[in-house]
Amino acid sequence: MTASKQPKHLSKAMAKWAEQRGDLYAAACPSRGVLDHVTSRWGVLVLVALLERTHRFSELRRRVAGVSEKMLAQTLHALEEDGFVHREVYPVIPPRVDYSLTPLGREVAGHIEILTDWIEESLPRIISARAEHASRKPTPSGEEAKRELRVRSK
């Protein structure tokens, strides 16, 4: 993005990042905030639900079982702010608001859908691995291991 095309509301620090690839490993990189929004429990589910079709708020709330109104509103706001979700308000009574994905949102949701599909398909193997892990004798923590070594060496 060239300086002339940058939105005027960007700070100088953000403008710097608007012109280069993000670096998730850099503490100050705004990509970390985007990562938080996209990979949060509710962010993942909202993005994949909106990949299916446009939803109203109440439809999304039913589709994403377990999300509170407050968390859904915060999640939608963050995803809208990041440019992934489009919020369309219709001037009717009662008010109607539709949520859909932007082209950028469809792109990220497509990647996330691959992960969510893999999780659903792999769930039996994951549950089996958890059961196997739980059945093993726990390994001692750092301090416990040191005490165990001292006892053995005496």
Annotate each PLM feature.
Residues 72, 76-82:
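Basic amphipathic alpha-helical segments that dock to polyanions
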Residues 52, 93, 107:
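Glycine-/small-residue-rich active-site loops that bind phosphorylated ligands and cofactors
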